[in-house]
Amino acid sequence: MGQENGRDDERPAHRVTVAPFLLCRFQTTNAHWEAFRKATGREKVEFAHETAPAAWVNWFDAMAYCHWLSAEWGMRGALRARLPTEAEWEFAARGGVEGRLYPWGDAPRVYQARRWKDGPEPVAGFEPNGYGLFDMCENVHEWCSDWYDAGYYAVSPAENPQGPAHGVRRASRGGAWRHHVKFSRCAARSSIPPEFRYADYGFRVGGEAVKEAI
């Protein structure tokens, strides 16, 4: 996890083990968000493309969606929805290839002059990574569950790191439609205060089996 020749908060590179977890193949879309909004009575949000990732979502919004989805899943099975940790997200982004810079390889893609210049693209417009996950490291920044600490890697546990116990900013991962490709690297870290909403911030649902139901 991390990149030794990356930015300061990506060092030191270190080996991490994560327990089995689930991660949605797609970023949460406007269509998904609209179902949540209708079910919970939230204010309607205008959007152009229902298959584009839901944006203008803060960390608390994303957590509320996960709690709602957990209740929906609880009616059908034994899964709990949640945001992924930074460690889980980076593991998933690499697609099974250790040390890979980007989900698709070690060089930036050529398509940086994108078709959609004023917002995120519909999901799954390009090939998935080795784990079948679409748009890892692109389209919108994705919220993680962790608090952010630039020096956390120096003290991070080797198994299932959850991030620091407290902080001011929440961690996010992945590149976005309006940011330089440097944020699209698997190891790149970003963060903002959890109450902030931006046009290039969304999320991807993670999950795990509920032990009591196994």
Regions found by a protein language model. Give the residues of each.
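A short N-terminal beta-strand-loop micro-motif at the entrance of redox/enzyme domains
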Residues: R15-P20
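C-terminal, low-complexity/hydrophilic appendages and adjacent surface loops
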Residues: D8-R11
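Functional-site microenvironments in short loops/helix caps that host divalent-cation chemistry
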Residues: G2-G6, E43-S190, P194-A199, G206, ...
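Short, mixed-charge, low-aromatic patches
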Residues: L23-F26, N160-Q162
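Short capping motifs at secondary-structure boundaries
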Residues: F21, T28, E34-E43, L69-R76
